[in-house]
Amino acid sequence: MTAENTAPATPPPPSDFVRDIVAGHVAEKRYPKIVTRFPPEPNGYLHLGHAKSICLNFGIARENNGQCNLRFDDTNPVKEDVEYVDSITTDVLWLIAGWADAQLGFKPKGAKPTALISQGRPDFYLAPTAPSAQSEAFFASDYFEQLYNYALELIQKGQAYVCDLSAEDTESYRGSPDQPGRESPFRSRSVAENLDLFRRMKAGEFPNGARSLRAKIDMAAPNLWLRDPLLYRIRHVPHHHAGDAWCIYPLYDYAHCLSDYLEGITHSICTLEFVDHRPLYDWLLGSLDLPRALPHQYEFAKLNLGYTLVSKRKLLQLVQEKIVAGWDDPRMPTLSGLRRRGIPASAIRNFVTGLGVTKFDSLTEVAVFENAIRNELNPLAHRRLAVLKPIKLVLTNIAAGESIACEGTNNPQDETPTTRPLALTREVYIESDDFAEVPPPKYFRLKPGGEVRLKYACIIKLDEIVKDAAGLITELRCTADLTTRSGQPNSDKKVKGTIHWVSASQAIDAEVRLYDRLFTVPEPGAS
């Protein structure tokens, strides 16, 4: 008779300041539907830090019967690749499988925003669809035409201009936190000239870096992100999704807020480094007189984990320098690496959800993650006996060729555990670390004259240590007390040590990979 393993209980829905904000909006019926998004740039593989964002955004959508779009913020063709698009899609689908599948928002393949009239004004919107063979993730690059038209509108309103400063001069003119910036000498160009130059930028008339489009805000603003930030730059580089159609590309801050709007996002949730970007997010949306409800940005503290890097840029360096064997190296904190290592998606979800959501950066001990994995696997994983560094043990009172039947429990945490047959034979292997010829005090494993129990079998006593001419141990000769097996008269006899073993004749070879922490310092990203 078999028994199903008992899965860990589902934890109650979490509570935090972001969810409190959303709950307030739901109560006042501010939006017809809660729509969040997970918008990675496809320039690397996802890691544990992304898992926190994925679970927060999909979790909020799940708790409110809403939707969470998977969107690629692919506005920098130099660093992005379809390999990353594929890996990110795989990782997200794996992480939410059986948990938030119903909340995943895709779009019809090849679909672009549809023109519509909202409150009497022209508008654009890209409606989601359920994942299928005919759908795909959202891409910011699918909005390039609309983003370009929005930029023309900003120019026409006198809120954007074409600037000829080099990247170095632009940075120099920006100033510092305690010193105002200087206005670009090209800031006063006429609307007509700016429109002409921007259209020619799009047509490919100028080389990389020759010109850029900047917002016209305030070069003396205390917030440096409001000092006439770049909106577009020239890059004659093919795009992984858009091909060769464009040679001007929008900057992240410009594309991100408008992509949120085009998708009908209600809550744009990101990490704390974007707090200073929020005024620009709001300025861009407010400057365009958009007719539909605007998204709002909310920030939370990202995951910092001890002995772990959670930075795509630094993880890429490990891959490029061949310190690890690729993005899915089992020592990597990438979702693909963790999956290859055998860590269940549910363990990752429970870990990041259990950390909570705050506005304060902190360092989480890696042991917390390891405990989350252990708690998830303990009720589910079948146990097996294994010996990695064997030493031969001969049970002298068992005849050669004799096999004594024993039973091992598959999972002792099952309420009705199943068992498997084991064979106790004359020769077995034990772990070399489970024997000490000269034992330290309070050593309870095998030692000269000592007794231990072979797990699921019987108690044995060490009688003789056999060595070769060089003085190296070749085998341990023991006596097995077969009356201490399960169901036998002395099965309740107690000894202080129980050790693993495998039959020398019936064991199978296995390749075992033991992975430890990749870094030896608690905060590898700090150096």
Model-found features: residue ranges?
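Generic amphipathic alpha-helical segments used as scaffolds and interaction surfaces in large
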Residues: A9, F138, S268-L272, K302-G306, ...
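C-terminal, non-catalytic macromolecule-binding modules
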Residues: C458-S527
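Intrinsically disordered or highly flexible coil/loop and linker segments, enriched in small
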Residues: Y31, D101, A160, P207, ...
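N-terminal Rossmann-like or analogous alpha/beta NTP/dinucleotide-binding catalytic cores
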Residues: T2-E183, E273-Q297, K302-S311, L316-V319
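Active-site cores that bind ATP or allylic diphosphates and position pyrophosphate for catalysis
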Residues: N76, V82, T89, K112-T114, ...
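Extended, domain-scale alpha-helical bundle/helix-rich regions
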Residues: G326-T425
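Structured alpha-helical segments in the cores of large, soluble enzyme domains
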Residues: K52-R62, V85, T89-V92, D244-H256, ...
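Short acidic (Asp/Glu) and glycine-rich catalytic loops that position anionic groups and cofactors
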Residues: G66-C68, H256-T266, A293-H296, K314-L318, ...
